[in-house]
Amino acid sequence: MNGISHRSVCLILSVFFALLGPSGVPVARAQSTADEIQRRLNKLEAEIVKGEDVSAILRLQRAYGYYVDKGMWEDLADLFAEDAVGNYPNGVYIGKDSIRKHFFMNVGGGKVGDIGLGDNRLYNHMNLQPVIHIGPDGRTAKGRWRAMAMLGRYGERSFASWADGVYEITYIKDRGVWKIQKLDYHSGFGASYATGWIVPEKRTASRASRTLAHPADKQRQMACEGFPEACIAPFHYDNPGTKTGGPIWTSSDAPSSKDEPVSGGTIDIQQRVNNLARRAMMLHDEQEIENLQRIYGYYFDRRMWDQVADLFAEGGTIEIGLRGVYAGRDRIRKSLDLLGPEGLRNGQLDDHIQLQQIVSVAPDGQTARARAREFSMAGAYEGRGTWSEGIYENTYVKENGVWEIKSLHFFPTFITDYDKGWGKDARPAPTASSEFPPDGKPTETYEIYPNFHIPAFHYRNPVTGNYPQYPKGEGRPMDEAIQAAMASVKSGGGKAMVSETKENTEAILAEAERQIQRVKDYYEIQNLENAYGYYLDKNLWNDIADLFAEDASMELAQRGVYIGRERVRGFLTNVFGKEGPVEGRLSNHVHMQPVIHVSPDGQTAKIRSRMMQQLNLGGRASMGASIYENEAVKEDGVWKYKTVHTYNTWTAGYEGGWAKNPGKYLPGQSEKYPPDAPPTLIFEMYPTVYKIPFHYRNPASGK
């Protein structure tokens, strides 16, 4: 009977029949036949494998961005299949070896084997906004990602620039490991930091025409090289609000080969149920930790220090830059006052965007580690603005079923004055306070940009399973830091993830089925959110409207509320202009940091997310930021928006930025196409600070 012994079937049936309710109706119908039990287990495992596939692809592509950041070209090349194709602006590279040479020689500017960037160079490469779909065969997948890059050189021959683009990537599962099969990069824009994203007076030479140390294997045929041209990078997916584009994977009852029969050709059902429950829980835990880290960022934005401190375990620690280590929740709370008093005040901006998490949960599900990125915009009105970016290497612990931060360690990459930019200004990392000294000295000493430093990776290469290949000289982490980071994610010493009592087999199985469905829901809602941003980029109003349920609503800024999908469609087309991208206009809407909570019944969800805008609407470069508090509903198995509510936080002209040139005007209700209801909240943007509602309580304290 497909690897399950007759004795096991009899045992499980007897357990299930023993679980009759008061009315005599079975708690589950799986006890009717051994085939039904087998079907449920096979379907559960097939769903878990697909969830693990999505998790692995997210990990793979996020690692890609971290490796590019630090010039870890060997680890980067290892993410590609042997026969992979890299379709970059300067040409097409065929085969892993050619792609590897491209990274070392063309991107790194050195010879093969030269790992690392060296001092005075910035090459930040943020991989954001994933839309992932697993192919029906389970062996291929496709993903859309946004790349946002900050490039520069400090000192002699200094420069600073921005770059943005879209990856459309095909992945392949090779002997159980996901790799990049084909990567197509579509340029969005490239811009000097000094001017921002303005229409250039004359186009620079195409990157394809430049002399390369490692020539491309084939010339790229590009339909568009990005702004100021009007083009759309092809979408690999149908609209996620439709039946064909909504599912992130196709469900099936096909058994997996992951659980091989034990000796004697049989698998104990209880063992299999427990193994599957453990795997489903680990996927759920990954998402819980992603939510936790993103919530930390939202609290930090508003200097909600009491809430930030409550996210830490009682014996937790915090280490920001070279300030030293503060231990214990009370000491953590007091240390945060060094960054300013509780609560953001008018005239202050302190955005801390949490990005690109790679989470590793311990086998027992009681501890975890994660690498994450923070991109920050801070400053004071009519004062000074700053950009900064850095890396977290954190640990987490599950206490009483709730994830908390055990240790938070933030490594700044760079801190720079807004007016000067990273080509001309580089600030040192903050050091220990004499006013409120830390409990311990910094666990690692290093210098930030313009010096080169790599925070040690806690995870191995997602493809090879090998330790990272660090440079031997400049930028290499301390040996002690490498050893500490690469230590296995150890058991927290708590209770086992699932009970092994046979009497609760049905409860464990039902909970695992529920959890993997919530995992799938989370991923599909993430696709919905990120697709919304891509459609906004290109003024695809009809695609945006098709993401909404029939009775949904939209409220943007102070424009009022539009109720019903067709009213949303009419609002977009009548107020914002014609459908599609426009020559000479840039309208980037970078969607980030979703905190997703699915209801217990799996039919509704609430989402907090963030958007950064990069705009050129008439020759003037500008930017802005918003917070969304959205709701989603599942209709016929497809997630759609129930409400989209945008809270604008700030806008600014690129020249001067948020500190010296904030845009205070908020558009009101349209006379041409009036809303169905007035705005639900009247507010003013930065430099005014107003309260944006949270749909959730603190996940650790419940406050």
Can you describe what each PLM-predicted range is?
Residues 125-127, 162-167, 352-354, 387-392, ...:
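Short, surface-exposed coil-to-beta transition loops
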Residues 31-66, 70, 78, 246-298, ...:
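Short, low-complexity N-terminal intrinsically disordered segments enriched in polar/charged residues
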Residues 24-30:
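Sec/Tat signal peptide C-region and signal peptidase I cleavage site
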Residues 140-142, 164-203, 367-369, 389-426, ...:
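Short beta-strand edge/turn micro-motifs at domain boundaries
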Residues 1-6:
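N-terminal secretory signal peptides that target proteins for export/translocation
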Residues 188-190, 197-263, 425-499, 658-703:
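A hydrophobic membrane-anchoring alpha-helix module
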Residues 73-148, 305-376, 541-613:
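A solvent-exposed, acidic/Ser-Thr-rich amphipathic alpha-helical stretch
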Residues 10-23:
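Bacterial N-terminal signal peptides
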